[in-house]
């Protein structure tokens, strides 16, 4: 982008508006992050299981209604043609929502890449943000017998979040570019890292506030276990805190020689085709880089496992350990805080202090993470340990949070070393699709296992297997070779 061509009379306007745009971007993080951290990760899976149990029947006698404290219940679907475990109901819904989200995100990415207008992207953010917030709000108003509507609203909310996530990520480099002007690439990278980090911090801080308020709201409810009021609060938070985006985000005069694409409904098909073609181009580029392929295979495996550990552990704690909604929200807060600390201190301790290469740091984090499903498996052998008590879940919440935060920080840093300069957007979109794609498979497989055994503890075997299999994959990664290949491709 050329900044010399910007008219002189707008020179004072550009940095001021750039700062306003970045403030608007912070509000995007602040408003939407509680949905994914609180609602998707904790509240919605628990509510799905709860609705399944309320409308379910006993496993050993389908003529008897399921009682709240019954251990094994199944939910009759489609007039009793299909009976699924109440935990599987939540897992299948999550898997399906990520599938639709992935398809929608790939399709929308073409529109985002082609239509660079900030005003247009603002409208997309506000539209899908409003749809997602209202879907979340309506979940909080459902009757317990509306168990077909609940997964539909969960899918709509998750798909909406996926779209605004893509649009929000695409706006950050544009805003930073206007802010730094003609400064060198190093300055751009530093500013991007700082602003991105602040946005993530605001998002996590927002999620923490929502979680704390949720505990108070659930405590004040009649049965002290009303998750719907917490979900309704998340929807209200998302809806209200996105309002400043409408006033802060605004177009900035660009180089008049730069080709502009204005969105038209007539070209929607072409935009969607462009999104899928871009994914295909990313795959073709990735095939030229052996270590990128190795990394993405390994990432598919560990991302699948660690994402699924969260939903599995939450459902396990509710169905097997009988933990209350307040217990589980507290567990979620502990995990989130430890993830924030892990993201900061794990790279600092292992990479900077101990001078370990990022590849080894990642392998250490995987081994650390594998302790979680391994400990769950010991419950088949021992009577008093192996996730038999509530306090064990809190300890594993700390353990899991550290591993999750460390993995998020290290994985992106390691992958960035393997990416050719100038093609970052292409390869990180592939990274994102790999991440989302893995989240389809894990919950689906765990759901099938739980449906077959009606014991969600068996899921820990599969999760442990995933983590162990990823170790030789990442051991085969050659970072120096990957850097050389990336440099060669960047000159092509």
UniProtKB/Swiss-Prot annotation:
Pfam families: ATG22. Keywords: Amino-acid transport, Autophagy, Glycoprotein, Membrane, Transmembrane, Transmembrane helix, Transport, Vacuole. SUPFAM superfamilies: MFS general substrate transporter. One of its GO terms (cellular component) is vacuolar membrane. Gene3D superfamilies: MFS general substrate transporter like domains. It is a multi-pass membrane protein. The keyword Transmembrane applies. The chain crosses the membrane at residues 27-47, 92-112, 124-144, 161-181, 199-219, 229-249, 292-312, 326-346, 362-382, 391-411, 430-450, 459-479. Coiled coil: none annotated. GO terms for biological process: amino acid transmembrane export from vacuole; autophagy. Belongs to the ATG22 family. This is Autophagy-related protein 22. The gene is ATG22.
């Amino acid at each position: 982008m050329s900044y010399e061509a910007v008219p002189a009379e707008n020179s004072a306007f550009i940095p001021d508006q750039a700062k306003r745009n970045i403030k608007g971007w912070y509000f995007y993080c602040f408003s939407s992050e509680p949905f994914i951290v609180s609602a998707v990760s904790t509240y919605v899976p628990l509510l799905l299981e709860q609705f399944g149990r309320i409308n379910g029947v006993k496993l050993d006698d389908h003529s008897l209604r399921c009682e709240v404290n019954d251990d094994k219940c199944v939910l009759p679907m489609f007039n009793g043609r299909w009976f699924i475990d109440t935990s599987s109901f939540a897992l299948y819904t999550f898997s399906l929502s990520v599938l639709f989200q992935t398809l929608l995100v790939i399709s929308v990415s073409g529109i985002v890449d082609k239509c660079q207008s900030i005003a247009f992207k603002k409208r997309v953010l506000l539209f899908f943000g409003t749809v997602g917030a209202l879907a979340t709000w309506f979940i909080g108003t459902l009757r317990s017998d509306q168990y077909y509507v609940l997964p539909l609203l969960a899918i709509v909310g998750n798909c909406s979040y996926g779209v605004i996530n893509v649009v929000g990520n695409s706006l950050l480099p544009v805003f930073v570019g206007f802010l730094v002007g003609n400064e060198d690439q190093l300055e751009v990278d530093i500013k991007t890292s700082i602003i991105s980090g602040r946005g993530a911090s605001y998002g996590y801080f927002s999620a923490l506030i929502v979680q704390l308020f949720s505990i108070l709201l659930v405590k004040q409810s009649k049965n002290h276990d009303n998750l719907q009021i917490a979900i309704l609060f998340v929807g209200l938070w998302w809806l209200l805190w996105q309002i400043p985006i409408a006033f802060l985000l605004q177009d900035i005069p660009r180089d008049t020689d730069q080709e502009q694409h204005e969105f038209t409904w007539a070209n929607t098909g072409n935009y969607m085709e462009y999104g899928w073609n871009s994914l295909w181009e990313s795959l073709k580029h990735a095939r030229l880089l052996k270590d990128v392929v190795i990394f993405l295979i390994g990432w598919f495996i560990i991302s699948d496992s660690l994402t699924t550990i969260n939903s599995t552990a939450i459902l396990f704690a509710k169905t097997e350990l009988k933990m209350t909604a307040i217990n589980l929200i507290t567990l979620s807060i502990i995990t989130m805080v430890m993830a924030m600390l892990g993201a900061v201190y794990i790279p600092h301790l292992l990479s900077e202090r101990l001078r370990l290469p990022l590849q080894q740091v990642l392998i250490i984090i995987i081994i650390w993470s594998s302790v979680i499903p391994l400990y769950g498996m010991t419950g088949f052998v021992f009577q008093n340990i192996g996730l038999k008590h509530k306090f064990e879940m809190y300890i594993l919440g700390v353990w899991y949070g550290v591993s999750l935060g460390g993995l998020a920080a290290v994985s992106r840093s390691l992958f960035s070393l393997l990416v050719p300069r100038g093609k970052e957007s292409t390869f990180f979109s592939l990274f994102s699709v790999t991440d989302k794609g893995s989240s389809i498979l894990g919950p689906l497989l765990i759901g099938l296992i739980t449906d077959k055994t009606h014991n969600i503890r068996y899921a820990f075997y599969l999760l442990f297997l995933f983590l162990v299999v990823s170790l030789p994959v990442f051991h085969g990664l050659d970072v120096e070779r990957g850097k050389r290949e990336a440099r060669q491709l960047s000159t092509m």
